[in-house]
């Protein structure tokens, strides 16, 4: 099981919720063996989290895969990834010469630049004018593209500084103050991202590069109320995983953590008592059974 972005333990602990512990319990009770592990630099795992990218995490996932195959060579071993964990599964598949199956829990299908543009638009619509949101996301895209580009750091930083100030000063002052106190502060915060190895890899990631090569069955799930990885993402997975048997399902009323939500906002994650939808877990088990695993 592959966790989402940020330092995560084996339970993918988020607030008071431990979704991976809940999912693992469900799968184990259904007859499936599960391997969970702390991310590098977290819990009992060694390594440097800060200087690692999703590719590094995919290498860890591949190592976990090979560990299981060594102990249980006849077993079918697949990846279950939540959010960035879906990205990690896509990359890891290329490192292990093909897993038995993939399950993406809000895993990316569209480019991460597109994903983050949609995420920002959804978040900002609650605090900005409609015109402000349109202006912001239109001019934000070039910044994200530069962050994920291959130019030298000094060139990237200069380009982002200029574009960030241009973006900030094009906004209505009331909208501008929602993102930063000044154009300089905004430019500094955005240009600093080029020094983050994880961020530069993330914004340069194109799922299509890996999806087109995956040959195992894929189950891709998204909650209808997910504003971090929008449900429209599912179509891209079905379109680009041309060699795979792909099943995509949009689960009604669920957020990014696969909780039944009411307001379906980020602060609500912590307020909800449900950790992970039983329907979502049943969907996974039924799919695995139907595929003969």
Predicted segments with their positions:
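Conserved alpha/beta-hydrolase "acid-adjacent" motif
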Residues: 227-233
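Alpha/beta-hydrolase active-site loop
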Residues: 19, 50-71
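Conserved alpha/beta-hydrolase
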Residues: 19-44
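Short, surface-exposed "cap/lid" segments of acyl-processing enzymes
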Residues: 1-26
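Primarily recognizes the serine-hydrolase "nucleophile elbow" in alpha/beta-hydrolase
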Residues: 63-125, 129
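Accessory cap/linker subdomain of secreted extracellular hydrolases
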Residues: 105-201, 205-209
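Short beta-strand/loop motif that positions the catalytic acidic residue
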Residues: 214, 220-222
């Amino acid at each position: 099981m592959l966790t989402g972005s940020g330092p995560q333990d084996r339970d993918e602990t988020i607030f008071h919720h431990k979704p991976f512990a809940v999912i693992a319990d469900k799968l184990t009770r259904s007859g499936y063996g599960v391997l969970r592990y702390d991310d590098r630099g977290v819990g009992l795992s060694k390594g440097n989290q800060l200087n690692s990218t999703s590719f590094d995490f995919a290498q860890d996932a591949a190592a976990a895969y090979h560990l299981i195959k060594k102990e249980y060579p006849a077993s079918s071993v697949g990846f279950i990834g939540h959010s960035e964990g879906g990205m990690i599964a896509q990359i890891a598949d290329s490192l292990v010469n093909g897993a038995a199956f993939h399950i993406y829990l809000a895993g990316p299908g569209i480019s991460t630049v597109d994903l983050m543009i949609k995420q920002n638009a959804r978040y900002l619509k609650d605090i900005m004018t409609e015109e402000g949101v349109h202006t912001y996301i239109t001019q934000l895209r070039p910044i994200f593209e530069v962050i994920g580009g291959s130019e030298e750091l000094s060139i990237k930083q200069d380009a982002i500084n200029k574009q960030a100030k241009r973006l900030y000063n094009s906004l209505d002052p009331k909208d501008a103050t929602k993102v930063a106190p000044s154009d300089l502060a905004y430019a500094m915060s955005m240009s600093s991202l080029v020094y983050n190895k994880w961020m530069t890899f993330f914004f340069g990631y194109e799922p299509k590069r890996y999806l087109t090569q995956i040959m195992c069955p894929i189950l891709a799930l998204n909650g209808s109320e997910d504003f971090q990885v929008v449900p429209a993402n599912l179509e891209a997975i079905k379109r680009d995983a041309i060699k795979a048997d792909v099943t995509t399902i949009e689960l009604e009323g669920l957020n990014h953590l696969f909780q039944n939500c009411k307001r379906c906002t980020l602060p609500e994650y912590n307020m909800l008592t449900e950790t992970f939808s039983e329907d979502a877990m049943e969907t996974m088990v039924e799919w695995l059974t139907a595929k003969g695993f």
